[in-house]
Amino acid sequence: MSSADKNLSSYSGEIPNLSSRVFGIVVAEWNEEITEPLYEGAVEVLLKHGIPKANIIRTNVPGTFELSLGAQWLAMKKGVDAVICLGCVIQGETRHFDFICNAVSIGITEVNLKFNKPVIFGVLTTDNKEQAFDRAGGKHGNKGDEAAITALKMLAQTI
């Protein structure tokens, strides 16, 4: 089922106490009107699950392409247990969209494997701004929420 048919921000299941864990969130500044609500959604979920605000570290990068390096910097920090990458790439008239989406998805995967830590892909890849807004707190939920839930669930597997 595609996310166009379902709001995926609701979930079920227990998440154990992870209040001692530290979460890094790297946020792309490009398309800030989209990425900021993604960030707010992710933080709200982490706080709701008992993660202290002091255990949430934010790093901004200029664009989605830079998320991989920002994630690596956070993953290298002593004490960071998981990293959430938040960005938005909107299809334009050129192939730039394809190159950025491909590079960032591979880059984030490589950081996951290199540091053996959850590095979560919270990047919207949409055809237009309306689709992006729909997934940044709109009718299809907030993918920032979902990225935080994924980080929590992945860390829960380590205890």
Curated annotation (Swiss-Prot):
One annotated GO molecular function: 6,7-dimethyl-8-ribityllumazine synthase activity
Gene3D superfamilies hit by this protein: Lumazine/riboflavin synthase
GO-annotated cellular components: cytosol; riboflavin synthase complex
Binding site for 5-amino-6-(D-ribitylamino)uracil: 30, 64-66, 88-90, 121
Binding site for (2S)-2-hydroxy-3-oxobutyl phosphate: 93-94, 135
Top-level class of the enzyme under EC nomenclature: transferase
Record keywords: Riboflavin biosynthesis, Transferase
Family: Belongs to the DMRL synthase family.
Record's function text: Catalyzes the formation of 6,7-dimethyl-8-ribityllumazine by condensation of 5-amino-6-(D-ribitylamino)uracil with 3,4-dihydroxy-2-butanone 4-phosphate. This is the penultimate step in the biosynthesis of riboflavin.
Protein name: 6,7-dimethyl-8-ribityllumazine synthase
Provenance organism: Cytophaga hutchinsonii (strain ATCC 33406 / DSM 1761 / CIP 103989 / NBRC 15051 / NCIMB 9469 / D465)
